[in-house]
Structure formats: C-alpha cells, structure tokens
Amino acid sequence: MKIKLFADGADISEMIDCYNEGVVKGFTTNPTLMRQAGIKSYETFAKDAIEEIPDAPISFEVFSDEFPEMHRQALKLNDMGENVFVKIPITNTKGESSIPLVESLVLQGVKVNVTAIMTAAQVRSLASVLSPDIPSVVSVFAGRIADSLRDPDPIMRECRLELSHYRLEHKAELLWASCREVYNIKQADDCGCQIITVTPSILKKLKLAGKDLDEYSLETVKMFYDDAEAAGYTL
C-alpha cells in the first residue's frame, strides 16, 4: 500500500515512540485530544513536539471561533517550525466558511490542514483556493461519515476527483480522518487517499495484518476461557 500513516494524539511520549519506530510518517493533534491528554499549555506542547520531532509533518489546530484571531494563531503556529501544518476547521461554530481565511493563509505561504470536512462540496470549494505549489492536507472525516450510516468510500473518491480537477493531487494530500478499524487503512488506500490518521490502539493492531484466521479463532476461544477461569465464574 502507498498510503502514509499519521499518528493522531497528544501524548508526547507516544508520539516519540511512534516517531522512533518509523511506522508513521507524520502527526496530527487537535484541542480535544490535547485536553484528554491533560495538556495545560498549548504553546509549550507544540514547541516540545516540534523539538522532539523536527523532520516529520505535525498538524496543530487553531482554536478561536473568530477569523481574525484564527489568522493570528495560524501565523504563530506556522512560525514555530518548517514541519508545521496549521489545522483550520472548514467552518467556525456559526457555520461560516473558513475558505477566505484559508485563501489568505495559502497566499502567505502557510501549509494548511483543513479539517472537519464531510462532503465533496466542501472539498470543491476548498480546492479552488489551495495552491499547486504549497503543500496542504484535506482532512475528510470518513469515520464520522460512516457513523451516520453512509458509506464513506464513494464520498472519498469524489473528494479525490475534486482535488484532481484543480491539478492539486501532488501538493494537496487527501487524508482519511477518524479511522475506526485497521481495515480502514486498506479502504483509504483503495480510495486514493495519501494519508490516514490512526490512534495508538489502531497502530498496535497492525501486527495482525495477514494473521491466520484459524489461529486467531483459537486464540479468541482461549481468551474467553482464560477470562472466565480468572473471574472464578460458576453456574
């Protein structure tokens, strides 16, 4: 498979481990993951991550709901390192489009990762302001699309076509976000995505790829038996 794995999280020690193992090619974070990890200082976390991982792309997200402040935060994050991609949500919480902000940042040479995308129409609008000369990431939340009982595959393929229409396929990378299971990696690769974000729990399951299913079945039976024994259950 050609697809690149990016680790999604905000635990510095886990990020360093992934970086040293060489399995993942980049990293993404967001305010929710940072809060869950107990991060108190956004700036300290960002600087520490860049210092520990200086030569792999890392995405940090702006957190204001006002576009002028988003712009200021984006420039500050961009200045922290050459490997930084600035995450911009496709809209603010009022549903107002972030496309004008993205256009302004791209014109200033900022590498953006536009996030929380769910539709090909959003990608179409975004593609019109991205640059074929500046790297960018288009994060489509395939896992959340699937949560809504919709098949994400045709949507992801349509998003890929939108980027190709604007001749952006070599600079604007399509990212399959909110991965739910290991098989999503194959799905994303088949759809033409260049990147998929994976959690540490998904990364640990990669060793199961190609595992003999009869052997896996027996291991599962043994797990149930051992847990029942350990619990001391009786009937």
What are these regions (language model features)?
Residues 1-16, 20-24, 28-108, 137, ...:
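Active-site beta->alpha loop and helix N-cap motifs at the rims of alpha/beta catalytic domains
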Residues 96, 103, 110-204, 210-231:
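Catalytic alpha/beta core domains of metabolic enzymes, predominantly
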